[in-house]
Amino acid sequence: ELPAAVRAWASADVPVDFHATHDAVEREYTYHLHSPGASLSRAEDAVEALSGTHDFHNFTPDETGTVRHLDGNVVGDGEFLVVTLTSDGFPRQFVRRAVTVIDAVASGAAGLDRIESLLGEEPLDGPAGLAPAPPEPLVLTAVEYPPVDFEPDASALASARDVFGSNAIDYRTNARVASTIAEGIDREQ
């Protein structure tokens, strides 16, 4: 049984040897990066520099599977940059580390030369390395499994909408409460 926060709303018949990780031919991740004041233009330049086929060995602790083709996009949404990355596979922590450098470039803390050095052959560890961004804003938004054809379940879809709709209201409410407290603290100063 899945935890209450995990929802499946479609299923498919697959061969016995099907493997959800290894049989996927494309994955898409979306990261909601809170970065007020960031330059969308600089973020777009960073995503463009990361796009294409590269050895991303400095973006993961993995020793193998680091050469990947990446397609990316970023849009501004208020105080957020919404970063979408698509590939045939992602090494561990790759998306979160890519977001770290996109944020650094977008905020002006780093230039595009930072991406060039991270894509270089030299391993960069410690202070020269790249820490992963927090996991909470990361969403796996699509996975492609040809020729698997998923069939949505109407009641599961309705349940998922209800759960995530309720979660959205709860989180917005919590954000308002936290903002009220922060504003109250500021007034006391």
What is each PLM-predicted segment?
Residues E1-Q189:
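Structured-RNA-binding interfaces characteristic of tRNA pseudouridine synthases
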